[in-house]
């Protein structure tokens, strides 16, 4: 997994078959914010085109795409394959750095946070889980970066 060399604005993505959750962070604060969802396109090319518009509109320099790694080593899921193909489609459209980041249990954690911490009903959680999962993915990635000490 490579570390970004000069990323300034980040887009976190939680890919799903129905919805794609989005989160945003930019230097110098790197405060991660959920920015909503987009509907997954009928195919990966349409989803990549919709994401590319967001990349351009927010001047994104680094995309952190949640990679749904299996809980057991050696297994490979169809969703993991779709994420890899989505990354390839994005690379065809944009020169931004695309990083596949371990997102195991991010949606489960987001769902739990919305239910237990926020007390939201299943109906109220719908649509919020994906962008919160994207926020958790992006925050996890940013937390892994070396901290810059400024005095």
UniProtKB/Swiss-Prot annotation:
Belongs to the YqgF nuclease family. GO terms for biological process: rRNA 5'-end processing. SUPFAM superfamilies: Ribonuclease H-like. The keyword Transmembrane does not apply. Its EC number is 3.1.-.-. This is Putative pre-16S rRNA nuclease. Could be a nuclease involved in processing of the 5'-end of pre-16S rRNA. GO terms for molecular function: nuclease activity. Its main location: cytoplasm. It is found in: Cytoplasm. Keywords: Cytoplasm, Hydrolase, Nuclease, Ribosome biogenesis. GO terms for cellular component: cytosol. Gene3D superfamilies: YqgF/RNase H-like domain.
């Amino acid at each position: 997994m490579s570390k970004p060399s000069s990323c300034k604005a980040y887009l976190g993505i939680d890919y799903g078959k129905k919805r794609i959750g989005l989160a945003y962070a930019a230097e110098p604060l790197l405060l991660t914010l959920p920015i909503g969802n987009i509907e997954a396109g009928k195919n990966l090319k349409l989803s990549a085109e919709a994401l590319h518009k967001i990349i351009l509109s927010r001047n994104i320099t680094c995309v952190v795409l949640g990679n749904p790694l299996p809980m057991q080593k050696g297994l490979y899921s169809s969703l993991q394959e779709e994420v890899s193909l989505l990354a390839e489609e994005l690379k065809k459209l944009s020169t931004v750095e695309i990083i596949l980041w371990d997102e195991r249990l991010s949606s489960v954690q987001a769902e739990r946070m919305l239910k237990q911490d926020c007390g939201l009903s299943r109906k109220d959680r719908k649509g919020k889980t994906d962008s919160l999962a994207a926020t958790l993915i992006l925050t996890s990635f940013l937390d892994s970066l070396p901290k810059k000490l400024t005095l």
